[in-house]
């Protein structure tokens, strides 16, 4: 009698087949994250290119915003929906457009389309970094760092208008449109005096400074291990030895500042921490603006400036500038409100 000892082959279902195909080694890795990333990124970019090329903002903002109307790259934009649309998702088949594509574009449906697909596309890109890090066998700090840009995008384009009356008050997708939004935040929220904005500026500019210092220090302390005109060709990705002298760099900065990094791991974590923390804190600040929270109001200075014409500080000057931004900007920015301000209430500088 013959006895066969072995393990029955496990049945492979459709999930295993799909998992193998998604994770196959190819020029552009797909992965499970790609099922979210690639369609959403394609839709967001395609919607933005379509909107900036063909779609007007006449019905939502009373302005031209496309190449077809004469705008250029800096002035074209996919504009936010009309204020009357509230926080509707503006689905093409929804009650606002009722399947009419042209009407959907006129109402600002492309903005909601680009914003939502863009947000999920960014999340898909972060998941892509998680997925590849796990497959390669490294830690997922790239994905954690990318949470900073995601937090900024979601807070600025989604959370802020959700706290306001409608999507209308979100930034439109365009260069000059973003500049308009920055002026709006300053005029209506005094954003530059917000401590979360200050932390964001410190993080981003501090990160740029750290990047420049680190790159320059490494270039300064490269080992002279090549005969070429430059040292770039002397480096091999698989070499075991160091390519620059950490000891020399530490000695240099110890002489400059009296203190210096002596641990490469702590140094690079600090370079990760500073800009990402700046992005996170600025995102928290934007959510505060969505709720119309005030930051620093130095009322005592405002009261004294109102009583004493000779008393003025940079704070009181900025408050007057903000009033000017609101008074001059609102009629042009919100034409549907039909704001009409009498000449005597419009703030003017001393020179006028």
Curated annotation (Swiss-Prot):
Record GO cellular component, one term: photosystem II
Species, as recorded: Synechococcus sp. (strain RCC307)
Sequence positions that bind chlorophyll a ChlzD2: 117
The protein's assembly and partners: PSII is composed of 1 copy each of membrane proteins PsbA, PsbB, PsbC, PsbD, PsbE, PsbF, PsbH, PsbI, PsbJ, PsbK, PsbL, PsbM, PsbT, PsbX, PsbY, PsbZ, Psb30/Ycf12, peripheral proteins PsbO, CyanoQ (PsbQ), PsbU, PsbV and a large number of cofactors. It forms dimeric complexes.
UniProt cross-references to PROSITE patterns, sorted A to Z: REACTION_CENTER (PS00244)
Positions annotated to bind a plastoquinone: 214, 261
Subcellular location per the Swiss-Prot or TrEMBL entry: Cellular thylakoid membrane
Protein's recorded name: Photosystem II D2 protein
Positions contributing to Fe cation binding: 214, 268
Binding site for chlorophyll a PD2: 197
Keyword entries, A-Z: Chlorophyll, Chromophore, Electron transport, Iron, Magnesium, Membrane, Metal-binding, Oxidoreductase, Photosynthesis, Photosystem II, Thylakoid, Transmembrane, Transmembrane helix, Transport
Pfam families hit by this protein: Photo_RC (PF00124)
Transmembrane stretches, start-end: 40-60, 124-140, 152-165, 207-227, 278-294
Reactions that this protein is recorded to catalyse: 2 a plastoquinone + 4 hnu + 2 H2O = 2 a plastoquinol + O2
Membrane topology reported for the UniProt record: Multi-pass membrane protein
UniProt cross-references to PANTHER family, sorted A to Z: PHOTOSYSTEM II D2 PROTEIN, PHOTOSYSTEM II PROTEIN D1
A biological process from GO: photosynthetic electron transport in photosystem II
């Amino acid at each position: 009698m013959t006895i066969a000892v072995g393990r029955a082959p496990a049945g492979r279902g459709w999930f295993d087949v799909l998992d193998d195909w998604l994770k196959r080694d190819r020029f552009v890795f797909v992965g499970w994250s790609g099922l979210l990333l690639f369609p959403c990124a394609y839709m967001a970019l395609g919607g933005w290119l379509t909107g900036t090329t063909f779609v007007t903002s006449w019905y939502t903002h009373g302005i031209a915003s496309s190449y077809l109307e004469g705008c250029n790259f800096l002035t074209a934009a996919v504009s936010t929906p009309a204020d009357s649309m509230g926080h509707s998702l503006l689905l093409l088949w929804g009650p606002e457009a009722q399947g009419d594509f042209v009407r959907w574009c006129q109402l600002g449906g492309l903005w909601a389309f680009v914003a939502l697909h863009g947000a999920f596309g960014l999340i898909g890109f972060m998941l892509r970094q998680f997925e590849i890090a796990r497959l390669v066998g490294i830690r997922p700090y790239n994905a954690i760092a990318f949470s900073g840009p995601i937090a900024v995008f979601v807070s600025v384009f989604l959370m802020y208008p959700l706290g306001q009356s409608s999507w209308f008050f979100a930034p439109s997708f365009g260069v000059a449109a973003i500049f308009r939004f920055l002026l709006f935040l300053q005029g209506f929220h005094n954003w530059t005096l917000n401590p979360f904005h200050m932390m964001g500026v410190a993080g981003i500019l501090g990160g740029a400074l750290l990047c420049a210092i680190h790159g320059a220090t490494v270039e300064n302390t490269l080992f002279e291990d090549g005969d070429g005109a430059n040292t770039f060709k002397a480096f091999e990705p698989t070499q075991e030895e160091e390519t620059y002298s950490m000891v020399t760099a530490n000695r240099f900065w110890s002489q400059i500042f009296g203190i210096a990094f002596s641990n490469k791991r702590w140094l690079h974590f600090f370079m990760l921490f500073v800009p990402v923390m700046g992005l996170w804190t600025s995102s928290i600040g934007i959510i505060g603006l969505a709720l119309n929270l005030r930051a620093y109001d130095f009322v005592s200075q405002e009261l004294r400036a109102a009583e004493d014409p000779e008393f003025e500080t940079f704070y009181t000057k900025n408050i007057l500038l903000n009033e000017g931004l609101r008074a001059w900007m609102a009629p042009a920015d919100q034409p549907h409100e039909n704001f009409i301000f009498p000449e005597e209430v419009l703030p003017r500088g001393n020179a006028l």
